[in-house]
Amino acid sequence: MSHKTNKFHKVLSSPFIYSTFQKLMKGDKIRKKILKLNIKKKNPKILDIGCGLGDSLEYIENPVYFGYDISKTYIEHAKKKYKKKGVFLCRNFDQKEIKKLPKFDYILLIGILHHLTNAQILNLLSNIKKTLKKDGSLITLDPIYIKDQNYFARFLISHDRGKNIKTKKEYLKMLKLFFKNSISRTYNQSFIPYTWFSMKCRN
């Protein structure tokens, strides 16, 4: 993982503070928007890599859900909150895990890519390809740098915990190495100013 760490970033390891901060930054609303827009199958098989507190479950109806995160605190919170609605695993998603899992309709990378080095992204995408159904979709959401960006939005994004925030061209370049078809959207948030970038990628 490619992280910045200061006192504020450490505070976000608390599930309550992290959840409150997400709501303040409208992260919950943009997550809901992209999941409702892109997940259409009934009872979908979902793999949520970097699932955090597991809150994607709030916006998906009756999924078969597997969530991975390396934060023990987040995973324990998710297990208590969602109980049998999903399987939550405190470990890295890697080659060993692939053998234990079914094929998925949707794989989620919500707020994950900008925390990874380019080498880590390529390795992760390779593993995702092996786990995704032929007609499945990868859905991503990350902050992005754009031309003529709101100053405050750029300031906030530059202070994100993730150190590998990219432009649209840079994000798409990496995804196109693994996926033939992709649809991308940029969302400019007015209050509090922020810029989000989402991709839906298919084989």
Regions found by a protein language model. Give the residues of each.
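Hydrophobic adenine-recognition pocket in adenosine-nucleotide-binding enzymes
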Residues: 112
